[in-house]
Amino acid sequence: MTKPSRHFALTPDAIASLPEKDWQAFRPGVSLYPLHGQPPGAQSSALLRYQPGARVPSHTHLGVEHIFVVQGSQEDESGHYPAGTLLISPTGSSHQVASAEGCIVLAV
């Protein structure tokens, strides 16, 4: 007898076909698709979808944040990050995020 899997895979095709109704407004031009946990204060993960030109105002991280750029590109004061980039923002770090072309990122 095999044990049930405790994980799931989210392929690029699966991300592209996520139901529009399940995306939640997060910031103007940015929507959120919760994957695990309930922020704030809890361990959580979500997809963030930026429309072209969307910005998230300057903010300070209360904990470590990991961002993986899945599609498109994202930028902040420190650089430009194309698909495939992993960003790690330590506790207490601040930045303002934008996406000129639009993107989808995984935030943990």
Name each region found by the language model:
Residues Q43-S45, I67, G102-I104:
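Structural motif
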Residues M1-A42:
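A short, N-terminal "cap"/entry segment at the start of jelly-roll beta-barrel domains
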Residues H36, A46-L48, P57-H61, S78-G79, ...:
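Short histidine-centered beta-strand/loop micro-motifs
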